[in-house]
Amino acid sequence: AFFIDRGLIVLDGEDITYQKEHVRSKVIGHLFQDPLKGTAPHMTIEENMALAYLRAKTSKNAYFSRINAADKAKFREHLALLDMGLEDRMKQPVGLLSGGQRQALTLLMATMVTPKILLLDEHTAALDPATAKKVLDLTRQIVAERKITCLMVTHNMHQALELGNRTLMMDSGNIILDVSGEKRAGMTVEDLLEQFAVCAGKRLDN
């Protein structure tokens, strides 16, 4: 883990700056750019979902014996949302899935128990366009239905303006632009690039 140079990290009124990773993982969901990083390949789909579920629901070491029939039915219900047929493959190792299927599964795992914040680190960048759209649409649906606070990192300017209600632009580790509300609603990619040029003193290609 990396620690901040200065300041505090406060989530829902609680200082989590130096909180242990296994503690804050109960309230923070995250997806990496690499679709292979969010799941355990040698464990089954059901076991991966059980790990995510138990991690968020229990305060002590979790054991698979705590997963009951009702929990497994909930797993199937969540998997059916993907429309990928994974609800009928729960006993298969995750390593047999495609990158897109694994990323979609990771999204379900990260939101199975609603987190206080969901962190998305370019989570569709490594996927083919069709799969990326499917995962992004599912992300939008889950975030909207559960009213989850979400922070998404992207290099896609269209996504930066289309998704969410606030756009931040960074340069060399510093936030140089923060737009929301009516100003953001009327912005185009060209406007965003121009604002970046004004704030950063240099041009950026889209």
Please name every model-derived segment.
Residues 133-145:
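Helical segment within the ABC ATPase nucleotide-binding domain
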Residues 43-58:
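Q-loop/switch helix immediately C-terminal to the Walker
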Residues 154-155:
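H-loop/switch region of ABC-family ATPase nucleotide-binding domains
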Residues 8-24, 65-66, 181-184:
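ABC ATPase NBD Q-loop/coupling interface
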Residues 174-198:
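Conserved beta-strand-loop-alpha-helix hinge in the C-terminal portion
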